[in-house]
Amino acid sequence: MNNFLYDIYPILPEIFILSNVCILLVYGVLFSSSIKLGYPLLAQNLGLLSCQILGCSFIITYYQTFLNLSSWSDFFINDIFTFKTKCLIFLMCLGWILITFSYINYERINSFEYWILILLAIVAILFIIQSYDLLTMYLSIEFQSLIFYILASFKRTSEFSTEAGLKYFVLGAFSSGLLLFGSSLIYGLTGLTNFLDLAKFFTGMPMLELSSWIGLTTGFTLILVSLLFKLSAAPFHMWAPDVYEGSPTSITLFFSIMPKLAILSLLLKLLILSFHDFITFWRIIILICIIFSIMIGTLSAFSQIKWKRFIAYSSISHVGFFLLAILSGNLEGISSSIFYVIIYVITMLGIFSFILTLRFYNYSYHYQTRYLQDLISLSRFNPALAISLTLFLFSMAGIPPLGGFFAKLFVLLSVLQTKSFGISIFVVLMSCISCFYYIKLIKSMYFSSINEWKVLYPINKLNSLLLGFSLLFISFIFYDIELLSILSTLMSFSFLN
């Protein structure tokens, strides 16, 4: 009985969400098809209920007594890193729902299934974060991927959305096959799937035969390539720009922040814990991905004319910084990677809050901005929005004293401790180059001339509040930067074991 309670206790938030998903599904099916009620639209109701469910799940997680143990026959882990990451996921999801709520009303996404899929995707992300076994890792990632394929193609009347979902499905299925094949190779050669057991096994790597070492290296490479694909790291980034562009904007925001944190947490467990004895090997792969990600993300962003493709390439560049922090393989690198992800997520929430609120009014209808040229002379239409976006872009570029500067600084300091001077100089140079396309956008807002005047649609109060909150966080983090630094360091302590 005690073992059963220890298994149930760490996943109480997931059980709570799944039970509510079943209730919402029954509620949606019964009421949306009711003739007496006139076939009501339930999307707004389910959106508010989803927000309440996630709020209650965060409270359940936050007030749980912390237990540093594994559960479900060591399939899941509940350490300090997992505990804090789950809290961050719930806060991000709440912010995402509040930011995108007005967009869903504007775009008339009236299907109640939308919110059920979002809740299931969040559960899948939570399972990925807690995974402590190759089997649960694969099943959780597949659970997440199947939902993401549907969400990417949710706009059935849009050719771009259908293309995005199909392309994501084909390439995602290929990467899942690599993950499964790599896991089966490792299990076939070792008979182990648990992360901690694999870490103990690989301490005797020098005693293995050459054929076994080649097989294990091949299996590990396939797993690493699959996870880098899910993280949209170059040269495995081909799907990201098209999927970001074709998906609904709210889903694009979801793709750009939620899976990043989940896959990063999984990478940290695999590279730092299970396969730490392969460090000389996986450092080469990670280093190649860093160079390609930062170079392709930076240079490709120059030629983009659409917002979502621009953000896709910008996020690929930031993935390079995630991996750069992992490259050091020490506690400072883990801490700086967590710090960088937190700053990145808050910045992306702020930028998408701007994109979702920037709607232009044309007689009898209003439309959302899609092109970067819509920013021309924005300072004349709405100076407050122009200043807000300027600060967010400066933060993405790493201009002091904004949050993005400290995030990049901590990553570079962790890399310099390992005396990796060459990659550090390369990253600094590419960061300087990336400043040009951010400054180019700022120039168009303040100094470019406009051919015709545009009328901005009134900004939603909730979106303006969230935009202001994220802006204050990014702008004034230097006043109490130790708070986030302590949090990220505390989360990294679980890897000391």
From Swiss-Prot:
UniProt keyword annotation of Transmembrane helix present: yes
User: Where is it located?
Assistant: Mitochondrion inner membrane
Regions crossing the membrane? 11-31, 40-60, 87-107, 109-129, 134-154, 169-189, 213-233, 253-273, 278-298, 310-330, 338-358, 386-406, 422-442, 466-486
Q: How is the protein disposed in the membrane?
A: Multi-pass membrane protein
The catalysed reaction is:
a ubiquinone + NADH + 5 H(+)(in) = a ubiquinol + NAD(+) + 4 H(+)(out)
Q: Which cysteines are joined by disulfide bonds?
A: none
State the GO CC annotations: mitochondrial inner membrane
Q: What is its main location?
A: mitochondrion
Q: What class of enzyme is it?
A: translocase
Query: GO molecular function, one example?
Result: NADH dehydrogenase (ubiquinone) activity
Enumerate the Gene Ontology biological process terms. Answer: ATP synthesis coupled electron transport
- Keywords, comma-separated and alphabetical: Electron transport, Membrane, Mitochondrion, Mitochondrion inner membrane, NAD, Respiratory chain, Translocase, Transmembrane, Transmembrane helix, Transport, Ubiquinone
Which family does the UniProt entry place this protein in?
Belongs to the complex I subunit 2 family.
What is the annotated role of this protein in its UniProt record? Answer: Core subunit of the mitochondrial membrane respiratory chain NADH dehydrogenase (Complex I) that is believed to belong to the minimal assembly required for catalysis. Complex I functions in the transfer of electrons from NADH to the respiratory chain. The immediate electron acceptor for the enzyme is believed to be ubiquinone.
Name of the protein this chain belongs to? NADH-ubiquinone oxidoreductase chain 2
